[in-house]
């Protein structure tokens, strides 16, 4: 509870104690002998203690031309109650309204907590070495390439690469992951995480304004400005609703006495009851609070949603499209299969590794990594790269060929075609075929589970787009049980495929695209919902996306769908409940059946119940599993 909330709580307690005393005194007849002005002054004390700020806000807003708001309604209703001699009811209305406001403030604080935890990732300083001493500087002043020192317990201020030291890194604030990650020399590291056990020296790779933490803070700060359709509806509704009910209350106070005759006091009281009931707090508070709670619940599991409009769109998602590399697969080439012909697997791998020893191609690197031994340069010579074919090289004095089918055909080597999914590397020496290696991009751990979860939450179609060969793409799609696959695509082709999928959708259906690369930015922008990888993803992809997975775990997309649907369900419940109760009590108040106490329930009671309902959105810890 904040200092301001504690002060309000004290005002409520003092006012409540005085209210109870006055309530007892009135019912015992103690106040009856006093003149009306003395009673008014006595009841004004607890009223002003608890409600002076409401009167001040209403007066200030009126002076600024903003007349019709909940402060104005409360002021007019309670002044009216004082005017007709209902002093106790006037104090009760203001007291319980402020109880509701305090409760609302507490609820908003709770729902903001996980988001403000994410906001707390901002580092306050960076340590750099000068003349053998550590000097504290502002992260904004650190240039790219500077070596910074991060001690145990300190927050990592800038993105960079570890050049010295080893430690466990707490990434919970960014990714929602409770298990620390190990970082050592050569590892990339992102700002905003907390260094655990060891001192690290890090060479910075980005300025602070371009760092991960700066971008996240910018995204979080902008999230609340992007409203969902239902929020915009409530904003427009409140704009017209409040003036209408105010005019209605005035007419209720004036017209019936003129037509039916009799005193104005009873009808003014009914008009005051009408005003209290009609206060739109339950709607104006609970709807944004529900969406804010949904965004907070998503951030708890490491998913950053950039606005309630995108949270609403996720709830309507029926098609999800994945880029393959880096999203469904690791983007790391591995030698997944060896098919020797007349030699051992070890011999095939050795010759292939030696043959690729002069190449800097990623596939060559994966073969050398699979070999796992130091390359003896003395055994190889005369390497020649043949564009579009492969390499020819002398290995132990024997002419060796490592490459694709074209190379085997060009050298007239009788090879055995390999139909395995992946990139096939053929190996031959002189005119002898030694065999083939299959190099594949491995499927990410949890990718199959992610697809299964998405289908369980009602996503109808899972599609994969890739620039890879048809056979490789089909193999991955079959392994993950995807509904559609489109292969051998250029970046522009991906946009075209998404356009086709969008045109096939019905009203109320939404399409999401999940990607991580710079070339994915146009597709992320074009899709109804763009989902980017926050850890491995490019800055352009994160900027273009509407939702960011802070730890690149696509299993959390299904959890976000559940959170968004629960949020929308609760928001709609609040709207229906608030309008229904208010409509009934408004009618009862207008005909004189409901009194000021029922009016207080219709306002404060409904608001509190709606707020409690909204807070249920935050209870989504089970979705992480």
Identify the role of each PLM range.
Residues 1-14, 241:
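N-terminal membrane topogenic signal
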């Amino acid at each position: 509870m904040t200092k301001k909330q504690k002060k309000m709580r004290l005002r409520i307690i003092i006012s409540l104690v005085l209210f109870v005393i006055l309530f007892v005194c009135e019912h015992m007849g103690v106040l009856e002998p006093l003149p009306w002005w003395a009673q008014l002054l006595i009841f004004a004390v607890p009223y002003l203690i608890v409600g002076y700020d409401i009167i001040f806000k209403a007066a200030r807003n009126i002076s600024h031309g903003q007349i019709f708001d909940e402060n104005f309604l409360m002021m007019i209703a309670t002044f009216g109650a004082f005017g007709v001699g209902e002093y106790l009811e006037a104090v009760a209305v203001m007291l319980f309204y402020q109880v509701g406001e305090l409760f609302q403030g507490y609820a908003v604080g709770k729902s903001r907590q996980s988001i403000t935890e994410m906001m707390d990732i901002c580092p306050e300083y960076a340590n750099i070495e000068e003349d053998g001493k550590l000097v504290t500087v502002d992260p904004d002043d650190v240039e790219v390439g500077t070596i910074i020192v991060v001690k145990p317990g300190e927050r990592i201020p800038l993105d960079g690469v570890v050049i010295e030291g080893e430690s466990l890194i707490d990434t919970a604030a960014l990714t929602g992951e409770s298990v620390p990650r190990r970082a050592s020399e050569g590892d990339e590291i992102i700002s905003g995480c907390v260094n655990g056990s060891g001192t690290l020296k890090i060479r910075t790779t980005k300025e602070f304004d371009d760092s991960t933490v700066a971008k996240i803070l910018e995204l979080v700060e902008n999230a609340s400005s992007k409203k969902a359709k239902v929020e915009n509806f409530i904003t427009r509704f409140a704009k017209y609703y409040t003036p209408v009910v105010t005019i209605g209350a005035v007419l209720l106070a004036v017209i019936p006495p003129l037509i039916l005759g009799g005193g104005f006091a009873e009808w003014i009281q009914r008009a005051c009851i009408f005003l209290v009931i009609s206060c739109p707090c339950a709607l104006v508070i609970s709807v944004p609070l529900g969406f804010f709670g949904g965004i907070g619940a998503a951030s708890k599991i490491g998913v950053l949603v950039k606005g309630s409009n995108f949270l609403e769109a996720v709830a309507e998602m029926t098609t999800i499209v994945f880029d393959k590399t880096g999203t469904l697969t690791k983007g790391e080439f591995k030698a997944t299969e060896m098919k020797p012909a007349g030699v051992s697997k070890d011999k095939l791998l050795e010759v292939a590794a030696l043959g690729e020893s002069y190449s800097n191609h990623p596939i060559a690197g994966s073969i050398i990594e699979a070999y796992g031994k130091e390359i003896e340069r003395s055994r190889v010579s005369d390497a020649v790269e043949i564009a579009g074919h492969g390499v020819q090289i002398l290995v132990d004095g024997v002419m060796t060929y490592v490459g694709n089918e074209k190379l085997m055909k060009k050298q007239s080597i009788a090879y055995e075609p390999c139909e395995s999914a992946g990139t096939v590397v053929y190996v031959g020496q002189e005119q002898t075929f030694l065999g083939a290696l299959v190099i594949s991009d491995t499927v990410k751990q949890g990718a199959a589970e992610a697809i299964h979860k998405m289908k369980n939450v009602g996503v109808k179609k899972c599609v994969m787009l890739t620039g890879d060969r048809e056979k490789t793409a089909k193999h991955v799609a079959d392994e993950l049980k995807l509904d559609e696959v489109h292969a051998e695509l250029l970046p522009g082709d991906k946009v075209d495929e998404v356009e086709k999928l969008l045109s096939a959708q019905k009203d109320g259906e939404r399409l999401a695209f999940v990607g991580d690369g710079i070339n994915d930015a146009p597709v992320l922008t074009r899709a109804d919902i763009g989902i980017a990888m926050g850890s491995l993803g490019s800055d352009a992809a994160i900027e273009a996306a509407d939702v960011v997975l802070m730890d690149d775990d696509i299993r959390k997309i299904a959890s976000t769908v559940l959170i968004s649907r629960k949020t929308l369900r609760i928001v709609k419940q609040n709207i229906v409940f608030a309008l229904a109760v208010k409509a009934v009590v408004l009618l009862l108040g207008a005909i004189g059946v409901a009194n000021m106490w029922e009016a207080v329930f219709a306002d404060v009671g409904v608001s509190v119940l709606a707020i409690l309902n909204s807070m249920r959105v935050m209870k989504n810890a089970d979705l992480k599993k």
